[in-house]
A protein has these predicted regions:
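N-terminal mitochondrial targeting presequence
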Residues: 1-46
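Terminal RNA-binding accessory module
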Residues: 33, 38-178, 182
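Short, acidic/hydrophobic/Gly-rich beta-strand patch recurrent on exposed beta strands
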Residues: 123-128, 268-274, 460
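Hydrophobic beta-strand signal
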Residues: 146-148, 242, 317
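Short, low-complexity Ser/Thr-rich regulatory SLiMs
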Residues: 151-153, 245-249, 320-322, 557, ...
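Extended interfacial segments that mediate partner engagement and assembly in macromolecular machines
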Residues: 167-178, 184-304
């Protein structure tokens, strides 16, 4: 592990003074402005405790023990319980009579009407007695649909069902919008039958419910959730697909007693069915970019031709890689992998498919990388990023320009250039290969990205060099202990955090409160764990006299047609009010 301080010295020692580019941020919330000006007493912060880490303990039903970070079951159960509670209140107010109810047996088909859409993207339908819920995929509020019951969770008052057909469509359903022949069975998408406008509104509601239900904060401390930032592309946006198959062909149809071996059967290659542990054979996925879709076709053919060489199943990789070749440069021979941004590409690591797109000053060449350890290249505006193809990088390139521009616009508070101690340092925790450190770098005198992954730091340093950013450094360290050696004054530091789905550890949040960065940008792929973590920051540490106030929260639609939404929250450091003398 590299020492953070020595790593920073290597790139800060040669820095000359430079002009800090101040970008106007949105005004702080009304509550924040009022407290700063009047030192008004802070009201009770919590209406109940924030949700704990999603460990599955409250669920009596069996869950995937390897997927503790997603919180899918807890989020679904929260929506179910709230629907039941609202219905119970309505029945009490109208003196509704109790209706006898007998839970149908598994695999029975029944007709139900969808009451609402859950944060998981599933429809929720009340049983006749109003005290039990059917979870129905691929539906919208108002739909009357036929479903097949597949799994009961009686102690939790709900059952999972398979969608069979629409009896009467709800007002938000438009099946003409469905762009995939597998929709309705594949678990990958949930919302293709909804207009994009309705999808964005639904995702805004997901963020609202996350903060209302999982933070425990009183409503006055949660700003109005901003409108969901739209993806420029709603199909054809995914730069990475990872289909899989369950078993290989080795040992099947093998030669015995001198006989010629029979051709082994090729298993389904694709994604899982909804509500089943079975794979669908997926020939094409319209969410993938053009080159990724070509790669899927090529890889399916390759696997089928070589299935006997697989002893077991496997997960395949299709990752888009982009090269920009100046028009005045020598033309690239067909099939030859170019050198991109001064970083050597990996030969023989792609499917051989090439798509060329002519731009004003250059030609883009797109290839589909299939080797997890090969280098892939991606551009965000004019910034170039190289990564191991199997490593994490955002999968929707079409939204990244607007996404990073939004964060740049929020990074520096209004009036920063007039402050006696302006923010001029960036600390990027969970930095990965440097997306935020690099795209925010022009705003700061010095920027430091930290990540636990050694491979990510290697890529990040290469990316800083390729983008000619001498004021940007990276260090390998555990994010839970990174604050111990940060060389920046907290009063002048912006902290960016982008943790995995499970959110920040309690130790990380405790150390962050000890460090006291002046401003925080919290980016999250799980708005429910984000809400939980931000509640800890808002509660603060009274002994350290530090807490945070939420300036803004907004969702970003990285994955159109799915129930997933990412969140960006901006927070400002403040202190506890001083008790008035008696």
């Amino acid at each position: 592990m590299f020492a953070i301080r020595s790593s920073v010295r290597r790139f800060t020692s040669s820095l000359s003074s430079q002009t800090l580019i101040a970008v106007q941020a949105r005004p702080a919330s009304k509550l924040y402005r009022q407290r700063r000006s009047t030192n008004a007493p802070v009201p009770a912060i919590m209406q109940n405790g924030p949700k704990k880490h999603f460990d599955g303990k409250r669920k009596k039903a069996k869950v995937d023990k390897n997927n503790k970070s997603s919180g899918h079951d807890e989020v679904l159960l929260c929506d179910i319980n709230q629907l039941l509670k609202r219905n119970e209140t309505e029945q009490a107010e109208t003196n509704g009579d109790s209706v006898p109810f007998s839970l149908p047996e598994k695999f029975t088909e029944i007709d139900v009407k969808i009451s609402e859409l859950s944060s998981t993207g599933d429809g929720l339908a009340l049983a006749e007695n109003g005290k039990y819920v059917y979870v129905v995929p691929f539906t919208v509020p108002g739909d009357t649909v036929r479903v097949k019951l597949v799994k009961h969770f009686e102690s939790l008052s709900y059952s999972l069902t398979d969608f069979v057909k629409v009896i009467e469509p709800g007002p938000q359903r438009n099946d003409a919008l469905i762009g995939c022949k597998y929709f309705g069975e594949c678990s990958g998408c949930q919302l293709q039958m909804m207009s994009y406008e309705d999808q964005l509104a639904h995702k805004r509601r997901i963020v609202e419910k996350a903060y209302a239900n999982f933070s425990g904060l009183i409503p006055e401390l949660i700003p109005t959730i901003g409108e969901t930032f739209a993806s420029p592309m709603q199909f054809g946006y995914r730069t990475k697909l990872t289909p899989h198959f369950a078993h290989g062909g080795a040992g099947k149809g093998s030669k015995q007693d001198g006989e010629e071996p029979s051709q082994p059967q090729v298993p389904p290659i694709g994604f899982t069915y909804k509500n089943r542990r079975l794979d669908m054979d997926i020939e094409d996925c319209p969410l993938g970019t053009d080159i990724v879709r070509r790669g899927l076709t090529s890889e399916r053919k390759r696997v089928a031709e070589n299935i006997r060489s697989y002893k077991r199943g496997a997960t395949l990789l299709m990752r888009e890689s982009t090269a920009r070749i100046p028009k005045d440069a020598a033309p690239t021979a067909d099939g030859e992998t170019p050198n991109v941004g001064g970083i050597a590409a990996t030969p023989n690591a792609d499917t051989g498919d090439v798509i060329r797109i002519e731009r004003e000053n250059y030609i883009e060449e797109k290839r589909c990388i299939t080797d997890n350890n090969a280098t892939s290249f991606e551009y965000v505006d004019d910034y170039i990023f190289s990564n191991k193809a199997g490593a994490f990088f955002q999968n929707n390139n079409s939204i990244l320009s607007g996404f990073t521009e939004y964060i740049r616009s929020q990074a520096i508070p209004a009036g920063n250039d007039q402050d006696a101690k302006p923010i001029k340092y960036l600390l990027d925790a969970y930095s990965g290969s440097g997306l935020f450190t690099i795209t925010l770098s022009p705003l700061f005198k010095s920027s430091l990205g930290v990540d636990i992954g050694g491979d990510s730091i290697v890529s990040a340093r290469e990316n800083a060099r390729a983008n000619n950013l001498p004021n940007t450094g990276f260090a390998a360290a555990d994010a839970a202990t990174l604050f111990k050696e940060v060389p920046y004054p907290p009063d002048q530091t912006l902290l960016v955090i982008d943790p995995p789905r499970k959110g920040c550890s309690e130790d990380f949040l405790r150390q962050m409160l000890d460090f006291k960065p002046r401003r925080v940008v919290y980016v999250s792929c799980n708005v429910h764990t984000q809400a939980r973590d931000i509640a800890v920051m808002v509660q603060g540490d009274e002994k350290q006299n530090v807490r945070y106030e939420i300036e803004s929260v907004r969702g970003f639609d990285f994955f159109p047609q799915t129930g997933h939404v990412e969140g960006v929250a901006i927070l400002n450091r403040t202190s506890f009010p001083q008790a008035e003398a008696v």
